[in-house]
Amino acid sequence: MPREFSREKRSASDSTTTSKRKYREGSEDSLPAKKKKIHPPKHEHNHPSVNELKKRIRDVKRLLNRVDLPADARIVQERALAGYEKDLDDELARRHRSQMIKKYHFVRFLDRKAASKDLKRLLRREQEISNSDLDRAAKKEKLAALAGKIHAAQVNHNYTIYYPLTQKYVALYAEQKKKKKESSAQSEKPNEPEAEVVSKLIYDTTGERPPVWRVVEKCMEDGTLDLLREGKLDDGEGEKSSQAPEQKKSKKSTDDDQSTRNKSSTEKVSDKASGKSRKSGDKQDSKPKRSAAMEGAYWSANEHDNDDNESDGGFFEE
């Protein structure tokens, strides 16, 4: 290879490397450095652990069962026990609330969508009637007939929003597929779909509204819908208020059952002990009775033998 060609090749390679270095190291022509995305820190929920709270409650109860515990330490532990039990109840209630929200989220969404659609339709109809050129009497009559439907639609809409989150949700609407005729309807309107999903109120067919519906209507008048949704209202809690005395009654019944079981067990033990003592006494009493009977039979047999001996001796003697 000639030297000139090698020098040209080297010069070309040096120029490419220098151009790359210039492109990399230069401030004007170089590409901007990629910035690292700074992710915000995740919000960590500092919820207590249920197992940890239960463990603490067991430890405190075990400590309170000690007889030699000082009075001041006992007071401190009793306060701690009350606090742990309250934290446990709050955590269980929070978990139950989140579970019920996840369970009925989609059903509530569909009901809210249908209720808002009905309410908007009725309000549009009311505006059309009020802007129409009808007589005052006819207009008044139609608006009065429409006012009841609007009120029911407003209650339905608030029912879907402010239903208590901690209770089982009872749906208001049921979806039905409405099929269309295939003959002249398709020829006239070919762009319309064959089936349409229609949501209808359940209590229109059954004639019975859910029990919470009346509570929502009353809360609309009182302005306590938020309390109803959070379950802080006496009427809205329903199940909670009924569950609390039932739990107390069940606790009392369990305590009574345990006391009766303990009494029955002690009575059984005492009956067993008395039965054993009676059996031992009967055995002791039966032993001398048997011995007396045996002795009587023995003496009677001996007397009979003596009589026989005397008679035999007299018979053979002459």
Swiss-Prot record:
The keyword Ion transport does not apply. Residues 49-69, 111-146 form a coiled coil. The keyword Coiled coil applies. InterPro entries: Efg1, EFG1_rRNA-proc. It comes from the Eukaryota. One of its GO terms (biological process) is maturation of SSU-rRNA from tricistronic rRNA transcript (SSU-rRNA, 5.8S rRNA, LSU-rRNA). Disulfide bonds: none annotated. It is found in: Nucleus, Nucleolus. Belongs to the EFG1 family. This is rRNA-processing protein efg1. It comes from Neosartorya fischeri (strain ATCC 1020 / DSM 3700 / CBS 544.65 / FGSC A1164 / JCM 1740 / NRRL 181 / WB 181).
